């Protein structure tokens, strides 16, 4: 890629480009302690909705939104302490879904949760102090992570690309550094 005018790296939260050039991008990576898992449901959700449960082991939040007609995303989040007390580490995906269906039965209104690689994770907060190196510009979650519940790292990368394009047009065809 040495002969390229510009390389846009938008390879996500686990960016290989950011890792390869970490001495230049100077990322700050902080592993957050809350646990979360993504699931789906046929439960209709009109708007982005938060459901909070004050469970016997601590608060649990369900971040929910429609992603297509008749289908909604359910992102469940809780503290590590709450997760451990519920013993989610002992459940497989279906076991976790079953337990969450029990906890959020009222909110699910009789609908089941749908699993698809619905593993429990902890999310890193990433922020790069430098957003470019030579002719490489880093974008989206590779550059700075947003909260996982919004599920729009690709949208953020596109917005970064639009802003960079606007800066290049404004500055004239110059280096990434000047833009």
Q: Which residue ranges define each predicted feature?
A:
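A generic secondary-structure signal marking the coil-to-beta-strand transition
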Residues: 35-37, 60, 70-72, 134-135
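Short, flexible helix-adjacent loops and helix caps
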Residues: 22, 86-88, 169, 173
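Glycine-centered loop/turn positions within well-structured domains
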Residues: 15, 72, 162
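Conserved FAD/dinucleotide-binding core of flavoprotein oxidoreductases
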Residues: 46-127
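Central beta-strand plus flanking loop segment that forms part of the substrate or channel wall
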Residues: 14-57, 80
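Conserved mid-domain beta->alpha element of the FAD-binding
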Residues: 8-9, 39, 119-179
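Core beta-strand elements of the Rossmann-like FAD/NAD(P) dinucleotide-binding domain
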Residues: 1-6
């Amino acid at each position: 890629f040495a002969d390229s005018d510009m390389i846009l790296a938008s390879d996500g939260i686990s960016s290989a480009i950011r890792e390869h050039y970490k001495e230049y991008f100077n990322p700050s990576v902080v592993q957050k302690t809350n646990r979360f898992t993504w699931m789906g449901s046929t439960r209709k959700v009109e708007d982005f909705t938060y459901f909070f449960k004050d469970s016997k082991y601590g608060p649990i939040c369900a971040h929910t939104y429609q992603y297509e007609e008749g289908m909604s995303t359910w992102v469940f989040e809780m503290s590590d302490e709450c997760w451990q007390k519920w013993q989610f580490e002992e459940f497989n995906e279906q076991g976790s879904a079953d337990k969450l269906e029990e906890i959020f039965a009222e909110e699910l209104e009789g609908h089941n949760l749908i699993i698809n690689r619905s593993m429990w994770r902890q999310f890193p907060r990433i922020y790069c102090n430098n957003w470019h190196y030579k002719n490489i510009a880093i974008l989206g979650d590779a550059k700075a992570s947003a909260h996982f519940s919004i599920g729009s790292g690709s949208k953020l990368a596109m917005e970064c690309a639009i802003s960079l394009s606007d800066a290049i047009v404004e500055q004239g065809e110059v280096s990434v550094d000047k833009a």
